[in-house]
């Protein structure tokens, strides 16, 4: 994440917190980010310097006025005016990071060799909440190369309980063992 994204995303969070709009702005940013991720040509158009700023601002108004909070629309216009609209995704990440910190939320991804049943995901979430004392937002992903077990991806570290990891550890130990 760039310094620009941290600065702008943090400033937007500060404003939203001051106005008690954290949840609404978070939802709007997620929606805008999803649309821009799905429509890279639209983002490219909004970032094209040969298109006058007023025209780009008009395109933003046309697409988003009434669909997102005015703070989000004005934030997008500010990024557009400053030539940093491509940083919106990073700004949204920083906003989410600040939101999670303020609301004691920890995002965790469980990576497994096969898809976990919903009841197992719920048990894992409950166990993580009990251990961390935070609300866990758990997502999952399948990676067949893991063979078995679970890899937990947290913002600041990974907890690797996969079969692949343990096999690599055994291999490393055997390589370093003198017979």
PLM region descriptions:
Residues 1-179:
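Elongated, mostly alpha-helical coiled-coil "stalk/stator" tethers of large membrane protein machines
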């Amino acid at each position: 994440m760039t310094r620009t994204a941290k600065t702008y995303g943090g400033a937007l969070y500060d404003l939203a917190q001051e106005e008690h709009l954290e949840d609404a702005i978070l939802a709007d940013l997620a929606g805008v980010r999803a649309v821009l991720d799905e429509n890279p040509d639209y983002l490219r158009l909004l970032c094209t310097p040969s298109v006058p700023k007023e025209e780009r601002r008009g395109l933003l108004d046309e697409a988003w006025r009434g669909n997102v909070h005015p703070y989000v629309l004005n934030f997008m216009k500010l990024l557009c005016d400053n030539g940093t609209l491509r940083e919106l995704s990073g700004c949204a990440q920083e906003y989410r990071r600040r939101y999670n910190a303020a609301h004691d939320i920890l995002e965790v991804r469980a990576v497994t060799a096969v898809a976990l049943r919903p009841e197992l995901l719920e048990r894992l979430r409950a166990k993580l909440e009990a251990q961390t004392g935070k609300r866990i937002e758990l997502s999952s992903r399948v990676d067949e190369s893991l063979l078995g077990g679970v890899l937990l991806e947290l913002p600041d570290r990974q907890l690797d309980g996969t079969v692949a990891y343990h096999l690599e550890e055994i291999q490393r130990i055997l390589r370093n063992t003198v017979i």
